[in-house]
């Protein structure tokens, strides 16, 4: 992978926020489980979304990329799922997408035969014990290899009661919420501890409802799921992504002048929390030309940030905290250690290289604000898209240019990030060792 030399300078202009990766995963899956032909518009073909498209294709959906939309011929009704099941081995390549893996493991258990899940990067280190416990209880066969993703499952999921802790990744609960309505009997998911990442569950329930499936949510303590339901085929537009918008909201908080377009103001996305966090720190938001623009003319102040409901935005809000007055504490963010990299360690290491003062804790960060970042150093993305984009926004506040190693990893979630960064006035060029 390559290196970029990125020069200081504020960003200015308008940016169309890319489609929500979280909603695109859900739309593709619901459409692929549907009873006819769906059309999904405003979709971005990031590496993770391609992984989900190809995974659902391997289960029998026919998915075609058109010029400006995705055409999805669904696997069809529960009866047709049974009729189309063939006892065979199918390989489901999740690439580096944790969402694809955890969403698809129970969905694949709708089918007879052997399912083999493979992937790359840190995906083999993502825990799947929650599913293994269910497999043990239901007699579903499985085998796996330590350290890499090579999981084989054989056996069909049965309806029933599923007890799950609320502090696990919401991806496990989402995977079951997709699958259980298609089983013969009724099911219940019982949450045994307080639910974290409620926003992601809300997104799942919204998508499922949009596609015609009903699930009763009893205050996130239990979910009641009738069996033998059918996903309807619909036309679906994916809304803008607040987890990607977070980078530009944070840039505005740090004195850039960016208008963010194509965001749904009543979105259920958990990462919309970035607005509340930045407003507590001093950001003022205004409407401009049907978009949003922020500024912090009175300065930024510290706050306490709970990472349990919005883990993906923690790297970039840590950057804002590093340049705010006072000491910010980030809590309940231990899950960041098992993302594409250990994001708590990566944020601490790379921002401290730039002159930040961050202390890493087991479940979070202590960030003492500084007045400026120095630059003239080499930082590393850790091959993590969110770390790479955080470093790009950090460069706008540095006194001197920085060199970012392994910048291409943004393709995982935001393939056109560097184009948008350049169009907003960001200045960078390729850099080779020895120059």
Swiss-Prot record:
- Quote the Pfam families the UniProt record gives: EPSP_synthase
One GO molecular-function entry: 3-phosphoshikimate 1-carboxyvinyltransferase activity
Q: Which SUPFAM superfamilies match?
A: EPT/RTPC-like
Q: In which pathway does it act?
A: Metabolic intermediate biosynthesis; chorismate biosynthesis; chorismate from D-erythrose 4-phosphate and phosphoenolpyruvate: step 6/7
Please state where this protein is localized: Cytoplasm
Q: Does the keyword Ribonucleoprotein apply?
A: no
**UniProt-listed Enzyme Commission number(s):** 2.5.1.19
Please give a single GO biological process term from the UniProt record.
aromatic amino acid family biosynthetic process
| Keywords for this protein | Amino-acid biosynthesis, Aromatic amino acid biosynthesis, Cytoplasm, Transferase
Summarize where 3-phosphoshikimate binds, as residue positions.
21-22, 26, 169-171, 197, 312, 339
Entry binding sites for phosphoenolpyruvate: 21, 98, 126, 171, 343, 386, 412
Catalytic activity reported: 3-phosphoshikimate + phosphoenolpyruvate = 5-O-(1-carboxyvinyl)-3-phosphoshikimate + phosphate
Active-site residues (renumbered) = 312 (proton acceptor)
Which Gene Ontology cellular component annotation is one that this UniProt entry carries? cytoplasm
Q: How does it assemble?
A: Monomer.
Q: What does this protein do?
A: Catalyzes the transfer of the enolpyruvyl moiety of phosphoenolpyruvate (PEP) to the 5-hydroxyl of shikimate-3-phosphate (S3P) to produce enolpyruvyl shikimate-3-phosphate and inorganic phosphate.
HAMAP family to which the protein is assigned, alphabetical:
EPSP_synth
Write out the similarity annotation: Belongs to the EPSP synthase family.
What is the name of this protein?
3-phosphoshikimate 1-carboxyvinyltransferase
Originating species: Clostridium beijerinckii (strain ATCC 51743 / NCIMB 8052)
């Amino acid at each position: 992978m390559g290196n970029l030399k990125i020069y200081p300078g504020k960003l200015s202009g308008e940016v169309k926020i890319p489609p929500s990766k979280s909603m695109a995963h859900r739309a593709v899956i619901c459409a692929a489980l549907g009873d006819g032909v769906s059309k999904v518009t405003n979709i971005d073909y990031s590496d993770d979304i391609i992984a989900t498209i190809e995974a659902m294709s391997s289960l029998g959906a026919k998915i075609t990329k058109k010029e400006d939309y995705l055409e999805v011929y669904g696997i069809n009704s529960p009866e047709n799922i049974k009729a189309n099941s063939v006892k065979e081995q199918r390989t489901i390549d999740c690439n580096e997408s944790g969402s694809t893996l955890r969403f698809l493991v129970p969905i694949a258990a709708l089918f007879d035969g052997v399912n083999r899940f493979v992937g790359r990067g840190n995906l083999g280190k993502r825990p799947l014990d929650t599913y293994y416990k269910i497999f043990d209880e239901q007699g579903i066969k499985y085998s796996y290899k330590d350290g890499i993703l090579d999981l084989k499952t054989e056996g069909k999921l049965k309806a029933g009661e599923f007890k799950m802790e609320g502090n696990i990744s919401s991806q496990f609960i989402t995977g079951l919420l997709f699958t259980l309505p298609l089983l013969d009997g009724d099911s219940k998911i019982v949450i045994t501890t307080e639910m974290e990442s409620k926003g992601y569950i809300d997104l799942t329930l919204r998508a499922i409802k949009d596609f015609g499936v009903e699930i009763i949510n009893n205050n996130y303590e239990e979910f009641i799921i009738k069996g033998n339901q059918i996903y309807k085929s619909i036309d679906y537009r994916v809304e803008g992504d607040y987890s990607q918008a977070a980078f530009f909201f944070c840039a505005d908080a740090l004195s850039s002048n960016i208008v963010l377009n194509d965001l749904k103001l009543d979105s259920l996305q958990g990462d919309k929390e970035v607005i509340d966090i930045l407003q507590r720190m001093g950001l003022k938001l205004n409407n401009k030309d049907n978009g949003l623009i922020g500024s912090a003319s009175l300065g930024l102040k510290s706050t306490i940030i709970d990472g349990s409901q919005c883990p993906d935005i923690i790297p970039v809000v840590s950057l804002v905290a590093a340049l705010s007055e006072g000491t910010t504490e980030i809590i309940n963010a231990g899950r960041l250690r098992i993302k594409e990299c250990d994001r708590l360690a990566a944020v601490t290491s790379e921002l401290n290289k730039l002159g930040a003062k961050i202390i890493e804790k087991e479940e979070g960060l202590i960030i003492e604000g500084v007045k400026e970042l120095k630059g003239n150093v080499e930082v590393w993305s850790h091959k993590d898209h969110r770390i790479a984009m955080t470093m790009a926004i950090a460069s706008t506040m540095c006194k001197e240019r920085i060199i970012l190693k392994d910048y291409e990893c943004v393709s995982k979630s935001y393939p056109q990030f560097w184009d948008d960064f350049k169009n907003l006035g960001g200045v960078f060029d390729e850099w080779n060792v020895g120059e």
